A protein has these predicted regions:
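A short helix-breaking turn/cap at a secondary-structure junction
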Residues: 52-141, 145-146, 164
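Acyltransferase
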Residues: 110, 114, 135-160, 183-189, ...
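Short helix-loop capping/hinge segments that flank enzyme active sites or metal/cofactor-binding pockets
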Residues: 113-127, 174-228, 240-245, 249-252
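Short glycine/serine-rich loop segments
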Residues: 1-96
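Short, Asp-centered acidic motifs that coordinate Mg2+ and/or phosphate
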Residues: 31-32, 235-237
Length: 266
């Protein structure tokens, strides 16, 4: 079928991995859609295609047995053409499931009622880069305008972000570990059918040491604690959904952003 193209400019990528879902929404082919997200697979397509996508907190949408080991890194989430539709789908998706001990109960008030309430946050943090990543100037400008909209509505907006300095190392290790656990058998039996990026990620996971995994889990715990403390002060954190605008559809992944080159797709 070829690559999934951006509905606003077919020379550009729709992003992935839920690019097809985002395009279906943007073109009116679908009313609601589902996406999965470990490292942006739901958020990047939503951003590239001009629709709404939400990566929920872990446990908000329950995993099933089919999720295998991927229970505390990747999540399932809703995609829609507007916030109210997305909230409606999240209400339908959320809730406890006996197959997932980390799943959370349904909240007393629905997400749809919250979306329709018209209430606004009191204090919002804004960060163009979360202190950890380059961001294309065009993306940074769009994010800055969004922050200004909050300020114009009377919300206190301050430039701040939680301390996420270990995020890249932690995510690289835990993602590779997940790939090794869930896909090593595929590498052994069907290597010729796997794309180079997946092969690389599995092999990175197979090379990990116990010490690296221990360090990554400790980093995750520390970042979670610092982020929870951060939200004692702020109601929301505004940040770019993706670091670049839609790139040419021929490109396999983002190779450079704001002068920084990347040697892998993660």
């Amino acid at each position: 079928f070829g690559p999934t193209r951006n509905p606003w400019d077919t020379s550009r990528s729709a992003a992935g991995s839920s690019g097809g879902a985002a395009v279906a929404l943007a073109t009116g082919t679908a009313w609601l859609a589902h996406g999965s997200d470990m490292g942006g697979s739901l958020r990047n397509p939503a951003s590239f295609c001009g629709i709404v996508g939400l990566r929920p907190s872990i446990g908000r949408v329950a995993h099933t047995i089919a999720a295998a080991v991927d229970r505390n890194l990747g999540v399932q989430g809703p995609m829609a053409r507007n916030v109210e539709d997305l909230a409606l789908l999240l209400d339908a998706m959320s809730g406890e499931h006996p197959a997932d001990p980390l799943s959370l109960p349904v909240l007393p008030n629905s997400f749809l009622s919250a979306a329709r309430s018209g209430s606004k946050p009191k204090r919002v943090a804004y960060s163009p880069d979360l202190g950890i990543t380059p961001v294309d100037p065009e993306v940074a400008a769009v994010t800055r305008k969004a922050a200004q909209r909050f300020a114009e509505a009377g919300v206190i907006v301050e430039e701040a972000h939680p301390d996420l300095r270990e995020a890249h190392e932690c995510f690289h290790v835990l993602r590779a570990f997940d790939f090794a656990l869930s896909k090593a058998a595929l590498l052994r039996s069907k290597r010729d059918l796997l794309k180079p990026e997946v092969i690389w990620n599995i092999e990175e996971g197979l090379k990990l040491t116990v010490e690296q995994l221990e360090r990554a889990e400790a980093q995750r715990v520390a970042m979670t604690a610092r982020t929870l403390e951060f939200f004692d002060k702020y109601d929301l954190l505004l940040a770019p959904a993706t670091i670049v605008p839609p790139f040419p559809v021929e490109n396999r992944y983002v190779a450079e952003c704001a002068g920084k080159k990347f040697d892998n797709y993660v």
